[in-house]
A protein has these predicted regions:
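RNase H-like two-metal-ion nuclease catalytic core shared by retroviral integrases
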Residues: 168-170, 175-177, 190-213, 220-232
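Short, basic alpha-helical/linker "hinge" immediately adjacent to a nucleic-acid-recognition surface
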Residues: 1-29, 39
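Short, basic interhelical loop/turn and adjoining N-cap
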Residues: 31, 41-54
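Active-site beta-loop-alpha junctions of metal-dependent nucleic acid enzymes
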Residues: 118-121, 138-160
Length: 264
């Protein structure tokens, strides 16, 4: 009986070629059933009918969806990689960050962090994420110095000229944070020691990046083009907070408006 019932699970998807092709493609691109369903609910894809997340899950578990079942990302408990911290002079803590930043009212207020190589590897990855649009910018740093961090940040500023403020942790690589503020023309706010949740947006993005750069990876062995591909994947997620637009679409929309956007 179970076998008979399973045969008809996901029938709505199976019988609609356009819908099935879209669902299969997006699952293979690591989109979640929630994201796919939400995207269709907001009519972001022309000519493709809406399907609920429950129907997508049933389809995946059916005999028709078996071949792509492995494409669904399994959420894993993430361990926080600790880097050396210490006393940094002249910091402005997150307590003094303007309330408008806390409310995600404008583009340009970012959080930034490092992803580090596994044991025996070298190199780090600078990750900068816009708090409002969730769009991420990645720059690998192969020789880890304060100067290299500043250079990587300036490369991101060229691609993300809207960058106005940044919230980060107390890594000693930010020892010359005042200098970095002048170079980037931004203000930097620091989280309290061991309060990683105060920069939750970039922490969540790091988790998405880890799908493509698992724990233990050696960043020095990855090319810049690899990180551009990862960046594109991360910025192609359908996000509920963006009304199921992708971060790339949201950024393009804001830039097209040619004004400071207050709402998506």
């Amino acid at each position: 009986m179970r076998r008979y019932y399973a045969k008809y699970q996901g029938k709505k998807i199976v019988e609609d070629k356009a819908l099935r092709a879209f669902v299969d493609t997006q699952l293979l691109l690591d989109q979640s059933p929630e994201g796919i369903s939400g995207r269709l609910k907001y009519k972001r894809e022309k000519g493709i009918q809406y399907i609920s997340k429950e129907s997508i899950y049933r389809y995946i578990k059916s005999i028709h969806g078996r071949r792509i079942e492995a494409a669904l990302r399994k959420k894993k408990k993430r361990r926080t990689t600790k880097r050396t911290t210490g006393t940094l002079d002249g910091r402005t803590f997150i307590d003094k960050r303007p309330s408008s930043i806390n409310k995600r009212m404008r583009i340009g207020d970012a959080e930034f962090d490092f992803i580090v190589s596994g044991k025996g590897g070298s190199g780090i990855l600078l990750v900068v994420v816009d708090r409002k649009l969730r769009v991420a910018f990645l720059e690998p740093i192969y020789k880890v110095t304060i100067e290299a961090v500043h250079t990587a940040a300036k490369k991101i500023k060229q691609r993300y000229p809207e960058w106005r403020t940044g919230t980060t942790d107390n890594d000693l690589l930010f020892a010359r944070h005042k200098e970095l503020e002048r170079e980037l023309l931004i203000r930097i706010f620091f989280c309290h020691q061991y309060h990683s949740w105060e920069k939750g947006t970039v922490e969540n993005t790091n988790g998405e990046i880890r799908v493509y750069l698992p724990k233990g990876s050696d960043i020095s062995l990855k090319t810049p083009s690899f990180f551009r591909t990862v960046e594109k994947r991360v910025n192609s997620r359908f996000m509920e907070c963006l009304e199921y637009r992708t971060p790339d679409e949201a950024l393009h929309r804001c830039r097209k408006q040619k004004r400071s956007p207050r709402a998506l």
